Amino acid sequence: MDIETPPTEARRYGLGLVNLASPRMGTKIHSVSDDFFAEAPRMLQDTIPVFVPDKFDDNGKWMDGWESSRRRQGGHDWCIISLGEPGVIKLVDINTAHFTGNYPPGAMVEVGYSLDGDINKVEWHTLIEHVNLGPDAHHLLESKYLSTVNLVRLNIFPDGGVARLRLFGDVQRDWANQKNDIFELSALRSGGSILGYNDAHYGDVNALLSEGRGLTMGDGWETRRRREPGNDWIVVQLGTSGFVDEIEIDTAHFKGNFPDKCSICLLYTSDAADEGLGVDLGGRRI
């Protein structure tokens, strides 16, 4: 399982952004106009899109993404996505990897918010205006609407295929109305995020903050083998400030490459960006 990491441009855009479209967040396809050639949920997968030359199914060529049939009656195709957690989307990546003669020439992204999930009552706002798309490429686009949303509608013109859709942003959880007394403050779904690290050569660094146990050795944070003095580090921003009562460090599936030991430091700051990142970040060692 090869997990896709954000393009370099996305990482430079802002530390701490998470992919709100990830199934890890509980995000699902709500509805779709047409996914005859390739089912829409594939578009949200965390894995790197692949091309398998000799793979076909009952409807034709198998593609790793969402692909609609060819339109003959005008109009355009769309896909509505229900976010697992409400959030503010700051950057969108429409990836047409491996779609060369069947990519959509254009796309537009709209967003909305619904308390009851009734699509018919949603007021849609433009997140990304109509843009031209190219074949087999990332299309990184800055958001035009920076308010909390939980529904996203990807419109493609007129039809075609999208390998992956990434919605980078911040989780917006209403902590004032939570019923539980204990929370996993570092979880992605709680608004936790990775602010920085010295190395993440293998695996998926965001899996470190995902719910449940890792599925394989690739479903976690792993650094390259260190040949020089020092140690590896990662900085996590919690979803909200709080008191840490218990910490779990799970090395599931890491057998010959688990860390010998670790240490954890805590820090309270109103702006992590002002503190800098790295082993000298400071804080209280626990």
Please name every model-derived segment.
Residues 268-273:
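Conserved small/polar residues in nucleotide/adenosyl-binding loops
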Residues 280-286:
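Hydrophobic alpha-helical segments, chiefly the membrane-spanning helices
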Residues 103-111, 259-266:
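Short, surface-exposed beta-strand/strand-loop-strand elements in extracellular ectodomains
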Residues 88-98, 154, 244-253:
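A short beta-strand element within beta-rich, extracytoplasmic domains
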Residues 114-117:
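Short loop/turn segments immediately following beta-strands, especially the blade-tip
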Residues 128-160:
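Beta-sandwich interaction modules
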Residues 1-78, 82, 100, 168-239, ...:
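Disordered, acidic Ser/Thr/Pro-rich linker "stalks" and the adjacent N-terminal cap
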